[in-house]
Amino acid sequence: MIKMFASDLDGTLLNALHEADGTIRRAIRELTEAGLHVVPATGRSTLPIGEHGFTGLALDACCSNGSIVRDSHGEVLKTWTIDPQITEELLKAFPDICFDCSTPDGMFSSG
């Protein structure tokens, strides 16, 4: 028995306008009504489901290339992090390179 449906967002669940069209919304609604957990997966940081046309659907999400997993209420369930000491060493070793950092609270950049 299938219990979960996970799919990438951009170019898969979302169209060129970065929205889920009616066909996708109906399919996701049917999956959730059948009892499946539908999990959008994305490289984006924490995902605001509503802005992509999924308003009213209880969807969990796998964000930041899998490093943040949150439930349908936005509660962070699990994070996988890089040791802060390693991050500090990288910033010192490569001062001219821009680093991006995703956290459950948002995105941060070194430059």
Enumerate the predicted regions with their spans.
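Detector for methionine-enriched segments
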Residues: M1-M4, M107
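Active-site phosphate-binding/coordination module
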Residues: H18-G111
